[in-house]
């Protein structure tokens, strides 16, 4: 199993090879994140551990891509979460819904930046850390880790081919 520190550059390379960073904008990646979060909510509601692990990994892949597009050090964000020792929630469904709330705020902040440019506001950093933290909490409740979930997602996509159509990567 690869570490998160090993997986992040591999995911960057995967996305570069598929021209995701060249052909999409950060908001496109947040829309993809939204799709993956909806799958996570459903998996948590169904209490489907394999689907939860897959969805956590998929959300992480899209967040890694978003952070790369916004020039945010995603490893720093992940390390901040993994080093936090606060109280964890005990409801996967509530945590997954909270991810959706944080993602909506991140999308709103990002949408305001479209056409404006400039520095990424603090709110974006806060919401990224919050989303990763909730993902880590759900993984913990499933007796797994972000690292294991990200490995599952990377192993699923690493050989995937496709193309960008209308602002979305479509797998072959």
Model-based region annotation:
Residues 1-56, 60-172:
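Flexible "arm" and connector segments at domain edges
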């Amino acid at each position: 199993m690869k570490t998160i520190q090993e997986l992040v550059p591999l995911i960057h390379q995967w996305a570069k090879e598929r021209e995701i960073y060249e052909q999409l904008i950060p908001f496109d990646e947040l829309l993809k994140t939204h799709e993956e979060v909806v799958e996570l909510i459903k998996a948590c509601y169904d209490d489907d551990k394999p689907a939860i692990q897959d969805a956590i990994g998929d959300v992480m892949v899209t967040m890694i891509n978003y952070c790369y597009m916004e020039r945010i050090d995603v490893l720093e964000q992940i390390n901040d979460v993994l080093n936090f020792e606060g109280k964890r929630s005990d409801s996967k469904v509530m945590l997954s819904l909270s991810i959706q709330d944080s993602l909506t705020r991140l999308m709103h902040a990002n949408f305001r930046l479209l056409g404006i440019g400039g520095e990424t506001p603090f709110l974006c950093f806060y919401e990224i850390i919050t989303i990763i933290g909730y993902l880590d909490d759900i993984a913990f409740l499933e007796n797994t880790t972000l690292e294991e979930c990200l490995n599952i997602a990377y192993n699923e996509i690493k050989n995937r081919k496709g193309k960008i159509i209308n602002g979305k990567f479509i797998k072959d």
